[in-house]
């Protein structure tokens, strides 16, 4: 769920009710005011993608040793910085490119999410099919957000008080638990506790998509949209 500009010329309401939204916005505004001129939104988008590659590399390399997970944790920080700052800096400097920014940002988000979840699935801690199931749930919610912009004029950046930043913090905490517990078999044989956690998150995301789709459909019917 990105932080760039609205794709439509008509006003779009940004729905952002995650727990850290206000604190994060203050931090981003503080950082924007101190960014040197050579730091551009495009550079920050690139930095965000570099962070996603770091996460992928850290998880996949953890097959060689748990210490590589520190690279994944560092990648989350880099990815947050680039992904959160690119749109914020564009708006701060009033150099928005609404259509281009929206298209590139969401395209990069999709690739970054794939890198992160594929990395988790290629690690010794989580099965690939479980990680890809969670990715599917996240991408379905992203699709819902994109559709809401078009049909409701709303950009949903959070669900149940959680957004991308909260999800990154959860994944960082999970990665620290991976380092502490190792990749030994769990109580359920081939299915580890990490599989259950990631699979559970995926199930929640899928359920949220279904509920939000139902809610949006009822809203559209109420305002006379019957395509």
For every predicted segment, state its role.
Residues 1-73, 119-227:
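Hydrophobic alpha-helical transmembrane segments
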Residues 74-118, 144-148, 214-215:
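Acidic (Asp/Glu-rich) catalytic motifs at the cytosolic membrane interface
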